[in-house]
Design a protein with these regions (language model features):
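Motif-centric detector for short Cys/His coordination patterns
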Residues: 1-82
Length: 82
């Protein structure tokens, strides 16, 4: 596998946390991805309870109270939500 290839299994989220300015996702292999919270307006405006109510899906994270879905691959690519 080249260094540019990413195995899908490597992208599974294990946990989600928030700092005042970032969304931080820890992957199953221990890596952490931190992205600016202002990239995701729904999450930025959400209450702590709404942010805490998330579901880890096969390829990303879903917040049912917010109807927000983020893929781990999208976070790595720097894709912002609109």
């Amino acid at each position: 596998m080249s260094t540019l290839e990413i195995e899908v299994g490597d992208l599974r989220a294990r946990s989600v946390e928030f700092t005042p300015t970032e969304l931080v996702v820890t992957l199953m292999d221990g890596r952490r991805i931190a992205t600016p919270l202002d990239w995701y307006p729904r999450l930025l405006k959400a209450s702590a309870a709404q942010r805490a109510n998330y579901e880890i899906m096969a390829m990303g994270i879903h917040w049912p109270d917010l109807d927000e879905d983020l893929s781990v691959a999208g976070m790595l690519k720097g894709q912002k939500a609109y």
